[in-house]
Swiss-Prot record:
GO molecular function (one): serine-type endopeptidase inhibitor activity
Entry keyword set: Disulfide bond, Protease inhibitor, Serine protease inhibitor
Name of the molecule in the record: Bowman-Birk type proteinase inhibitor D-II
Disulfide bond sites: 24-78, 25-40, 28-74, 30-38, 48-55, 52-67, 57-65
Positions annotated as propeptide: 1-8
Database matches in CDD domains: BBI
GO cellular component, one term: extracellular region
InterPro entries for the chain: Bowman-Birk_prot_inh (IPR035995), Prot_inh_BBI (IPR000877)
Short name of one Pfam family: Bowman-Birk_leg
Species this chain originates from: Glycine max
Family statement: Belongs to the Bowman-Birk serine protease inhibitor family.
Residue numbers marked as site, Reactive bond for trypsin: 32-33, 59-60
Amino acid sequence: MCILSFLKSDQSSSYDDDEYSKPCCDLCMCTRSMPPQCSCEDIRLNSCHSDCKSCMCTRSQPGQCRCLDTNDFCYKPCKSRDD
């Protein structure tokens, strides 16, 4: 059983690094509709990126969080293609 909690993106986290909080997504899924409905499936530790309006985190330590927002675009990838 998984216990989840919802956080607002303005709540502080133990990871306050600007680079970590920038909006990005490595695993973006979109519908084929026009406009597309896209969501990021990335899991981040303890918080979601700074633009996330609806963040869901597990209560584990560290928390595993996913942004539940739906947009009509994908954010740029978090990892560079050269990695």
